[in-house]
Swiss-Prot record:
Keyword terms of this UniProt record: Antimicrobial, Disulfide bond, Fungicide, Plant defense, Pyrrolidone carboxylic acid, Secreted, Signal
Signal peptide: 1-29
Transmembrane regions: none
The keyword Secreted appears for this protein: yes
A biological process from GO: response to insect
PANTHER family xref list: DEFENSIN-LIKE PROTEIN 1, DEFENSIN-LIKE PROTEIN 14-RELATED
Source species of the chain: Arabidopsis thaliana (Mouse-ear cress)
Function, in words: Confers broad-spectrum resistance to pathogens. Has antifungal activity in vitro.
PROSITE patterns: GAMMA_THIONIN
Gene: PDF1.2A
Protein name from the UniProt record: Defensin-like protein 16
Subcellular location: Secreted
Pfam families recorded: Gamma-thionin (PF00304)
UniProt induction comment: By pathogens, methyl jasmonate and ethylene. Up-regulated by ORA59/ERF094.
Length: 80
């Protein structure tokens, strides 16, 4: 019985050691800030078109139509 416990302990220790070295490196996420699109005109009804315009014309990371009183506006997400 003691030999079985030793083997189980050794296997468990090996798994813990393997998991410690195999953990993926965490990359710090870049914070994004909202900025109203400078090139979009009118009410925003198509988030995909807004996203493409933000990325291609304004160099943003992302874009979407968001409700900003009193209407939906194209909002670009740029690095802070």
């Amino acid at each position: 019985m003691a030999k079985f416990a030793s083997i189980i302990t050794l296997i468990f220790a090996a798994l813990v050691l393997f998991a410690a070295f195999d953990a993926p490196a965490m990359v710090e996420a870049q914070k994004l800030c909202e900025k109203p699109s400078g090139t979009w005109s009118g009410v925003c009804g198509n988030s995909n078109a807004c996203k493409n315009q933000c990325i291609n014309l304004e160099g943003a990371k992302h874009g979407s139509c968001n409700y900003v009183f009193p209407a939906h506006k194209c909002i670009c997400y740029v690095p802070c």
